[in-house]
Design a protein with these regions (language model features):
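Glycine-rich segments within core transmembrane alpha-helices of 12-TM secondary carriers
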Residues: 161-187, 319, 323
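Hydrophobic core of transmembrane alpha-helices in multi-pass small-molecule transporters
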Residues: 106, 121-142
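C-terminal ends and interior cores of transmembrane alpha-helices
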Residues: 101-122
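Extracytoplasmic gate region of multi-pass secondary transporters
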Residues: 48-52, 267-324
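Cytoplasmic membrane-interface "Motif A"-like loop-to-helix N-cap segments
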Residues: 89-100, 332-340
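Cytoplasmic helix-loop-helix junction between adjacent transmembrane helices
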Residues: 132-172
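Juxtamembrane intracellular "pre-TM" segments in multi-pass secondary transporters
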Residues: 13-24, 231-274, 300
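Residue-level signature of mid-helix packing/kink "hotspots" within the transmembrane helices
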Residues: 46, 73-81, 141, 175-176, ...
Length: 340
């Protein structure tokens, strides 16, 4: 059943004179694929935050909507942990686009609770919204793991910090587009679906338009991404760049079982736990601001939805310079010692 996710077999290595040009071409192609693909996930991740101010006008209370909002975060955390082990044993070229398409389809269905139930059946609408937003979060959890897999196979340890920092800007690019998409998606396409009923235009801008774009992004990502260098007839990145991490062995190129991943490399990795705990507090601040920013800006500051959308855009883009500097420092100053 899951054979379509299996990593592709290693091909016979190309002639030596073709390896350098092929490697350079594939590396940029693959990097572009995971950058665009990961940005696509953020086009269909936190859209519900943009919808909250409009949903409140339909009679939904913020306490109820906060439950729906939290389902996304819970599902995302669980999925990154569980689906990450599946990703480690899957073809990144298939796994990433599949997750993005499923997230986009789930996002499209988010119009259903308002369209078919509305405030008249508020409890049912909240339950359906919560389930759908849980699915959006779950499928979004399929985005980071294949990108991490691709990055470690195509970029060596001493360049990985810089490349990771550039790639990590993808989530800021994708997240920044949510606000403008909500505004212009409603403006351009809202009347196609709802005629003169402008109160529902936000459903198209917030859910349907970004989801349609994300599906197109998934197709582009599939065309660009390749799983490993060996599947393209190339040597490992360590051999190609003569850049071996400490304690490197050819055995590290093997596909591990879920048991080996969890019990040898996750549960007993103290540094991983330190980073996870620290990151949890960072995300409390980050998403505490991000999730409620559109509502706060509209209700407390008097912003209209267009102004709130562009403020959302600015918040995400402001993170890009710091991300790039940190990645460069981890390579050039700390020599690949990310934990430092």
């Amino acid at each position: 059943m899951w054979n379509f996710l299996a990593p592709p077999a290693h091909k016979q290595e190309l002639p030596a004179e073709k390896i350098d040009s092929a490697y350079k071409s594939y590396r940029w192609q693959v990097f572009l694929g995971i950058f665009i693909g990961y940005a696509g996930f953020y086009i269909v991740r936190k859209n519900f935050s943009m919808a909250i101010p409009e949903l409140a006008q339909f009679g939904f209370e913020k306490g109820e909507l906060s439950i729906v909002l939290s389902m996304n975060a819970v599902a995302y955390a669980l999925s990154k942990f569980l689906m990450g082990s599946v990703s480690d044993r899957s073809n990144a070229r298939v796994f990433l686009p599949l997750g993005l398409v499923l997230a986009a389809v789930s996002m499209m269905f988010m119009i259903g609770p308002v369209q078919f139930f509305g405030p008249e059946q508020k409890s049912l609408a909240i339950i359906v919204m919560a389930v759908l937003n849980f699915l959006v979060g779950w499928f979004n959890g399929m985005g980071w793991p294949p990108c991490g897999r691709v990055m470690t196979h195509w970029f060596s340890v001493t360049e990985r910090g810089t490349m990771m920092s550039i790639w990590n800007c993808a989530h800021n690019v994708g997240g920044a587009l949510v606000g403008p998409m909500a505004v212009y998606g409603a403006l351009w396409f809202g009347s196609w679906f709802y005629g003169a009923d402008a109160s529902r235009y936000f459903l198209i801008g917030t859910y349907v338009f970004p989801a349609a774009v994300a599906i197109l992004v998934a197709l582009v990502a599939y065309c660009l991404i390749r799983d490993t260098p060996q599947s393209c007839g190339l040597p490992t990145i360590e051999k190609y760049r003569n850049d071996y991490p400490k304690n490197y062995s050819e055995k590290q190129e093997e596909v591990l079982t879920a048991k080996e991943i969890f019990f040898k490399h996750v549960f007993n990795n103290k540094m991983l736990w330190y980073i996870a705990i620290a990151n949890a507090f960072v995300y409390m601040v980050r998403y505490g601001c991000l999730d409620w920013a559109p509502t706060f800006l509209k209700e407390a500051q008097g912003y209209d939805i267009k102004q709130a959308g562009w403020a959302y855009f600015a918040y995400e883009f402001a993170a890009i310079p710091g991300t790039l500097v940190c990645g460069w420092l981890s390579d050039k100053v700390f020599k690949g010692g990310r934990a430092m």
